[in-house]
Swiss-Prot record:
Its job: Catalyzes the ferrous insertion into protoporphyrin IX and participates in the terminal step in the heme biosynthetic pathway.
Bilayer topology: Peripheral membrane protein
Gene designation per UniProt: FECH
Keyword set includes Heme: no
Top-rank taxon, per record: Eukaryota
InterPro entries: Ferrochelatase, Ferrochelatase_AS, Ferrochelatase_C, Ferrochelatase_N
Location within or outside the cell: Mitochondrion inner membrane
Pfam family for this entry, one: Ferrochelatase
The protein, known as: Ferrochelatase, mitochondrial
Catalytic residues (UniProt): H230, D383
GO molecular function terms listed in the Swiss-Prot or TrEMBL record: 2 iron, 2 sulfur cluster binding; ferrochelatase activity; metal ion binding
Organism from which the protein derives: Pan troglodytes (Chimpanzee)
Amino acid sequence: MRSLGANMAAALRAAGVLLRDPLVSSSWRVYQPWRWKSVAAAAAATTETAQHAQGAKPQVQPQKRKPKTGILMLNMGGPETLGDVHDFLLRLFLDRDLMTLPIQNKLAPFIAKRRTPKIQEQYRRIGGGSPIKIWTSKQGEGMVKLLDELSPNTAPHKYYIGFRYVHPLTEEAIEEMERDGLERAIAFTQYPQYSCSTTGSSLNAIYRYYNQVGRKPTMKWSTIDRWPTHHLLIQCFADHILKELDHFPLEKRSEVVILFSAHSLPMSVVNRGDPYPQEVSATVQKVMERLEYCNPYRLVWQSKVGPMPWLGPQTDESIKGLCERGRKNILLVPIAFTSDHIETLYELDIEYSQVLAKECGVENIRRAESLNGNPLFSKALADLVHSHIQSNELCSKQLTLSCPLCVNPVCRETKSFFTSQQL
């Protein structure tokens, strides 16, 4: 019994920010109203229109002609309503690419049921659901509109959303793509920096789908598996940072510390050779080059849980440490997230920018807006796909290389799946 309890405790620590039990004062609900209201409205709209069917509805887009090229936008997703939280957590805990737990098939339902009420409260605080599907749809619409102009030979283009843990699931999106009779399919990760636990998991889902149904794809697959230094992505981040710096008092602006915050990883994953830390660092370096190193900065990591070593320093500890050293003007920049979700809207905006900032005596703390509906970001996505099509490459050179100490045999099968495609 003691062993089982220890295993459950380890499982509870394994899911990052989604499993945390923050005590948040209700008196600090609104800190950045210009952002809160827009996100709350988006989430409310999602709540009203969410479908509660067993499977996902086809992703409806206006099409005059049969689509020729499909772009599958891959991400983990987020629950649209409070009622979706349990199933979201259940799928997350069952994902062996993300975490490996003892007796996972039994532990996952237990943990999901136990944690649902607390996670529902976090989503209630950000408007009742995640806006990530809204933003992904908006980005996809802008992307395919530009692509039809940039690449008429591969048009019409259609975007599909493939989430790992909520509808529309990756597998459901693939089924729709197959029904649409596409000539070409591009698996486009929405994580700029590659990690085996994020992009790797989504690509593994594509391989597993075809392996389980026992048939080959009718369309030609390729993948955009990372894009940490794309010039328009860097420009978007730089623009949003400059915009937010303008909100600091003029006399304090030059001393604002820019904290680039990314989701942390356990050092056990990093030490296997996961490229995520290096790719996040590359993004930060390019952004600061674009900004001509206008302010002091650091790369910090959020969402660590449990006693095991993770990438550091942690975002919350960094805020505390800076304040103790008299640096009390801070700009948080979510550098590994392109759309708002629980880790920006709750962890950064509430836990850190409201509660922690009050405790530490921060003078001014702000968070750079996520890329969300920025038209330049849709242009970046279109440019990435257009360049990928023109390159005639199946994937990046990096994807062909397994982590030196990889322990997941499915990764090798997935790499073989994509590198064996014929364009």
